[in-house]
């Protein structure tokens, strides 16, 4: 393993010298395939089809000389066919890890009673660790880890899941030394799982009491980076499904083709990989390719067979850095004591409709800046606080769905409707100011500066780890920031004073504070912020 990691570092050194980004900002790609042995929704021949899918994925990676991460659900791990496949045919340097969905054979091996309808039941209260007590979670971890070591000779270093609770993740790290985890992208309601407002891409150190929430301190964090999965379109994924109970999907998944975009559309794949390889990312960028075998080979084949050679080509060109999930986890821990600031910058959109999107994340907040032509708004701002304990940390979830959220200041999805696009806009004389010719500039390791032109002067937006700055220093007219939402939106805001606004999200109190500027309540919007000396500065750190 030391030799493998040394090789990775050498590749990083070569790759980082070749692309336009800063030398300390590698663009990692993980090919992660997670493996189930059973899928009750498929019908006859299900087990054979699932196995055939995984075998074909592995063969294609071998053909193009790529290493992958294969994460095994318990039922697949104890199946001799998968054991032989991965022991004999898996390419050197690839990785076998754990996929943390809970199945009937896993539960029964732990001496617990299975409560599901099927041997694998995807509902939150039986199919995920959140549906079990803390003591049950420990037993489930112990049984899996010992069986894995019995089969493969070591404990897994990577554990993935659509979502995983902090108690389980912390226990895995302390007792078994896992080095990396991965969790589903942000989504609202898809499959009954809501993960909303989190660190948008790349990776973060999670809170000890909430695995979805980035931690702010070393004492408050689990020292295992959580990587966000599936490769969301930074322009179109967010708004997909506004006005409905569930988001659509525009991701790198090889089966995806929502609205003519996604991982089965060659042009979109090329656009996405190019954007992630060349756009400004600050500390590093991260792409997860691959697919769960439940979608079956015939459905994913076309997209998978296009993506793998495209990825191989970009690795050969030095634009992407190939790594397993655990290698990324070790690199992250070697380079960051705390969650770094990262960004995803889409300077155009696949449909060529003059849309742009910038995602910025730090350990304190995330923000999305969005353009539709020159029309600009902050589409999303969510704050992070490691003290917000998950509903599932110390008690089992009892519902078939689940919910993980953070602390919203702006939510352009939940507070919008088909008629109203919610957002925080720059306004002058009651009209939204367009921001033309935006330029994105990196300042140091953690700051993005966005410059552009408005009718009242040049605007400068600065995204720092602990604050957001909006300034038009030599304005030719009055301006302000205004939050507009759909009138029916459920908002978290409470008492407002000139320098602070109180808020509450599912019973957790937080505040929004201004370093410069002042809050004003107004009848034509939810609230406004008036600048001071040409600037508005939000403090994004939740006070202790």
Question: Where is each model-derived feature located?
Answer:
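Acidic-aromatic substrate-binding/catalytic surfaces of carbohydrate-active enzymes
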Residues: 369-448, 456
């Amino acid at each position: 393993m030391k030799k493998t990691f040394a090789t990775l570092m050498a590749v990083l050194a070569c790759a980082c010298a070749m692309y336009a980004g800063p030398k300390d900002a590698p663009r990692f790609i993980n090919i992660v395939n997670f493996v189930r042995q059973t899928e009750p929704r498929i019908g006859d021949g299900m087990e054979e089809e699932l196995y055939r899918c995984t075998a074909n994925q592995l063969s294609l990676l071998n053909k193009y000389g790529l290493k992958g991460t294969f994460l095994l659900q318990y039922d697949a791990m104890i199946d001799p066919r998968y054991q032989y496949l991965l022991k004999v045919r898996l390419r050197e340097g690839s990785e076998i890890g754990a996929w943390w969905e809970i199945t009937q054979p896993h539960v029964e091996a732990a001496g617990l009673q299975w409560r599901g309808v099927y041997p694998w039941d995807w509902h939150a209260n039986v199919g995920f660790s959140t549906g079990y007590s803390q003591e049950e979670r420990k037993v489930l971890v112990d049984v899996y880890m010992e069986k894995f070591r019995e089969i493969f000779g070591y404990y897994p270093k990577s554990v993935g899941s659509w979502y995983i609770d902090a108690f389980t993740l912390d226990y895995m790290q302390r007792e078994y030394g896992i080095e990396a985890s991965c969790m589903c992208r942000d989504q609202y309601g898809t499959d009954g799982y809501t993960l909303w407002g989190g660190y948008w891409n790349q990776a973060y150190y999670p809170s000890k009491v909430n695995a979805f929430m980035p931690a702010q301190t070393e004492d408050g964090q689990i020292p295992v980076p959580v990587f966000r999965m599936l490769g969301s379109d930074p322009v179109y994924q967010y708004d997909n499904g506004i006005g409905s109970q569930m988001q659509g999907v525009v991701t790198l998944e090889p089966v995806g083709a929502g609205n003519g975009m996604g991982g089965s559309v060659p042009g979109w794949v090329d656009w996405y990989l190019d954007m992630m390889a060349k756009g400004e990312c600050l500390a590093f960028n991260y792409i997860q390719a691959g697919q769960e075998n439940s979608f079956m080979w015939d459905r994913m084949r076309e997209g998978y067979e296009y993506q793998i050679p495209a990825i191989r080509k970009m690795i050969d060109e030095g634009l992407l850095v190939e790594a397993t999930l655990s290698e990324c986890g070790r690199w992250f821990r070697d380079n960051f004591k705390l969650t770094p600031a990262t960004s995803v910058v889409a300077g155009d959109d696949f449909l060529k409709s003059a849309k742009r999107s910038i995602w910025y994340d730090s350990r304190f907040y995330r923000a999305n800046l969005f353009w539709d032509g020159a029309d600009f708004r902050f589409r999303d701002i969510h704050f992070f606080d490691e003290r917000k304990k998950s509903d599932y940390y110390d008690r089992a979830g009892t519902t078939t769905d689940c919910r993980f959220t953070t602390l919203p200041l702006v939510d352009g999805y939940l507070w919008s409707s088909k008629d109203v696009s919610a957002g925080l806009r720059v306004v002058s004389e009651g009209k939204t100011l367009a921001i033309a010719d935006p330029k994105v500039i990196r300042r140091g390791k953690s700051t993005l500066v966005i410059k552009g032109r408005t009718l009242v002067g040049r605007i400068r937006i600065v995204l720092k780890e602990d604050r957001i700055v909006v300034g038009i220093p030599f304005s030719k007219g009055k301006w302000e920031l205004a939050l507009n939402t759909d009138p029916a939106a459920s908002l978290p805001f409470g008492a407002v004073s000139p320098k602070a606004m109180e808020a509450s999200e599912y019973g957790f109190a937080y505040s929004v504070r201004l370093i410069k500027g002042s809050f004003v309540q107004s009848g034509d919007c939810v609230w406004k912020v008036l600048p001071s000396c040409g600037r508005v500065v939000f403090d994004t750190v939740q006070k202790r």
